[in-house]
A protein has these predicted regions:
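Short alpha-helical segment of the dimerization/phosphotransfer core of two-component systems
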Residues: 54-59
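A conserved beta-strand-to-alpha-helix junction within the catalytic ATP-binding
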Residues: 80-95, 126
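Glycine-rich/acidic phosphate-handling loop/turn and adjacent ATP-lid/helix
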Residues: 159-193
Length: 231
């Protein structure tokens, strides 16, 4: 992707550089005012300023995501390489996931009772998979269950660790796609920032793949595969 012949990573780097300072300045002044360094505030003023501060925090997080995406596109990110249990990571992420509780949407983990060892950057893969879980819970409109199903595909070369995330009806098709060339991933969605584009690039940097459910509702589920650890 490029704009007017300028490489996409450079565009991202320039945007981050231009945005970071004003966001930091505005956030700093808002917090000075909230601490009443310029005088006392009414309840109404405090409420408005707190809302503005939350918005600045979100913009700051988006700027950080832009920086990370640009670095991934430029291959400037050094990934850690260590063996870890992917199944245990899935259980850990699910236990801390609270999105959807207020709408009676719950998360059910399956297939994580046995270790599934992979090699890679546990911190970055944790963020990527956590973002996929959060997106699945956030985008489900009705009460129900989102399933996270872990499995190992050992008859392929290379053998894969597979994680499918979605409604019950989508899981089989998501898992079946792991053994061949999987369909594309729908990463550009409003309201989720850049965590999904970042997640896809992190997974692919580990030699894996990420894809969406096929058909009329590609956002109904997603799945990923990572090479199983060889030692």
């Amino acid at each position: 992707m490029s704009g007017e012949g300028i490489p996409f990573p450079r565009v991202m780097s320039l945007a981050v550089h231009e945005l970071r300072t004003p966001v930091t300045v505005v956030t700093g002044y808002l917090r000075m005012v909230l601490r009443e360094q310029a005088g006392p505030l009414t309840d109404k003023q405090r409420k408005m300023l707190e809302e503005a501060d939350r918005s600045c925090v979100r913009i700051g997080a988006l700027v950080a995501e832009m920086s990370e995406l640009g670095r991934l596109e430029s291959n400037e990110v050094a990934l850690a390489r260590a063996n870890f249990d992917l199944a245990a990571l899935i259980v850990e992420l699910a236990s801390g996931m609270h999105e959807g509780h207020d709408r009676d949407v719950r998360l059910d983990v399956r297939g994580a009772n046995q270790p599934i060892m992979v090699t890679g950057d546990r911190v970055r893969l944790s963020a990527a998979i956590g973002a996929l879980m959060h997106a699945a819970l956030r985008e489900r409109g009705d009460p129900g269950t989102i399933v996270v199903e872990c499995s190992a595909l050992t008859h392929t070369t290379p053998p894969w660790a597979v994680v499918a995330i979605g409604d019950e009806p989508t899981l089989k098709a998501l898992g079946d796609a792991a053994g061949a060339t999987p369909p594309p991933f729908d990463e550009w969605r409003g309201g989720l920032g850049l965590v999904l584009p970042i997640g896809r690039r992190v997974i692919e940097a580990h030699g894996g793949a990420l894809w969406s459910a096929v058909g009329d509702a590609p956002r109904a589920g997603s799945a990923l595969r990572l090479p199983l650890a060889t030692s």
